[in-house]
């Protein structure tokens, strides 16, 4: 190649790289918005459909509380359709579902969020290209099952189940979870040394601060003779316990996320993890 041509190309490449670096926005600890995320949809056994949502809080450190209303609404049918009002930092996959009827057809829902003065919206529907199977991936892996007692019932997948508890602001509230999983390994991968299931607790809604004794409590594996009942053929099962302390009275919703070895967001394939929620009524 002619040296002059090579020099021009090299300078052009350096210029393009410099230009790209100029427009790369650095991460921000705070002051950024929250973007709703449409993960997809899946059919339910009764003929209805579940639309799965997550979000992306673009702040590295700032968690946000956005009450239901003008700054946090899903319409039509809203403003409240079960969405979070507390937003953890960064990307959060498949945090909740909205159920729509079997005749929903080509209609749309729109989730609107206003955070730090920045508005973001996502319109969602039942586009066939966005159909999911959050209960089994291509390798046959299934999400962990979650129960609130050792006897169950046990439910898996993003819709989950709900428990109601009560307490007061001066005493920690005990939180106990039983899990069961098929301990499926990604084909061709080495069996991980980490536990087959990991749990993460977080505040989903509520007026005050929530402090967990451990938001990622270890799961104590149960012996085969004491394994949970009601979850199909568990290879791994166990119990995890923690407590939550609430800064003030009010109605709270806590979320517990159970991940298997596929990790957050199921490597982008929307399987295999499970959610469950605990509604806690806190008195003085």
Regions found by a protein language model. Give the residues of each.
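Bacterial N-terminal signal peptides that target proteins for export
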Residues: 1-6
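N-terminal signal peptide c-region/cleavage motif recognized by signal peptidases
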Residues: 13-15
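Boundary at the C-terminal end of the N-terminal hydrophobic targeting segment
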Residues: 18-20
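Extracellular/lumenal mature domains of secreted and surface-exposed proteins
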Residues: 22, 28-38, 42-44, 55-57, ...
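Short, well-ordered beta-strand segments enriched in hydrophobic/aromatic residues
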Residues: 49-55
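Ligand-binding face of N-terminal immunoglobulin V-set domains in extracellular IgSF glycoproteins
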Residues: 93-99
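Surface-exposed, short loops/turns at beta-strand junctions within beta-sandwich domains
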Residues: 102-105, 247-249
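Short, aromatic- and glycine-rich surface loops/edge beta-strands on solvent-exposed regions
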Residues: 105-117, 254-256
